[in-house]
Amino acid sequence: MEIKKYITENEPKMLEDLFSLIRIPSISAKPEHHDDMLACAERWAQLLLEAGADEALVMPSKGNPIVFGQKIVDPDAKTVLVYAHYDVMPAEPLELWKSDPFEPEIRDGHIWARGADDDKGQSFIQVKAFEYLVRNELLQTNVKFIFEGEEEIGSPSLESFCQEHKELLKADVILVSDTSMLGADLPSLTTGLRGLAYWEIEVTGPNRDLHSGHFGGAVANPINVLCLIISQVTDAEGRITVPGFYDDVEEVPQAERDMIARIPFDEEKYKKAIHVKALFGEKGYSTLERNSCRPSFDVCGIWGGYTGEGSKTVLPSKAYAKVSCRLVPHQDHHKISRLFADYILDIAPDSVQVKVTPMHGGQGYVCPITLPAYQAAEKGFEKAFGKKPLAVRRGGSIPIISTFEQVLGIKTVLMGFGLESNAIHSPNENIPLDIFRKGIEAVVEFYLNYK
């Protein structure tokens, strides 16, 4: 049966199964969802078996369970290891959603729900393509699946799992659908990812919250100090001021900068889409360079003092911030973590105590476009979308990708189908049904060309 016909005939069941996953609020960042993590893993194992896997196991790790499945068609054939994650980001702020984030809806040709794209929807694309190949006796490669439940919190348990199960995870290439394209009519393959380093900063002043009238002006305010510290991490030209930060940053080759410059990009449309009047970033680089192949610093959250209704004249005892740096290949996140912490402690005034706690991180990654699996993915996109995909670096991070290369010795092809408008990590996450269908077609074509 031709793939388009297969999708049309089976789509109601496909969506029913996908929705059964989405309805499970597998939020790894919240301990109260511990049972949901197991439920989601078990549901995935069941769906892998139904799709045609020989076996599907829910395996223990140091954290949330890991789903492993496989179908071996020939011990001498090539093996593809499909990686995905079943955990999702918290849905807050809930009031900004147009529908229940964990009760999927189809509106205007899109599936709307938390995880519709990242990563339940995209990983489902992989599994449905696999299912089609199995049922139509077209699968000529061995396929293994590893689905984790901690990607959104930095994959703290996956490296040790890979170390313990190297033989089980042995493969020729890893295939991942957890990245995005440049546009619905502009398919692209991700050839690089930025790394990540993440910290929490705690600033402590007096031993208790104080009356701002009695003590204001005489005692350092931790929130004021925290803001001052953060303001010194970048300069007016958007460069990070941490000593040694740029030591291992590889300058983008001119040939790659020229390629980036040829990518269709409407800056006015970009600003309009996110409702900002002007853009800002490191001087000397374009917007597409800044958010893909240059490092960056961001404050992800900041809090302290009184934030309830009305007013309370208080000089708070503590202030906190969660901050992160996106890193580029060759920057070691452990080294950057140390440099950053040392710098923050060095510039902190004596009037407060400062604690910098590293959270999670990971290395950047680059995929060579000469890789046979990459070229098979190119053919997949060309078949499904009608045009050859552009090769682009993306600004996001999937820390485990570099770990796979280090621990398992396997390269990864990032065959993602997301769009910026899919609003991952934000309210009203969605995925267009048209892209969902084309994604299945593209992955099928990948397997037909990777033998």
Report the location of each language-model feature.
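An extended, acidic, His-containing surface patch that forms the Zn2+-binding/catalytic region
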Residues: E50, G183-A184, T241-K318, P329-D342, ...
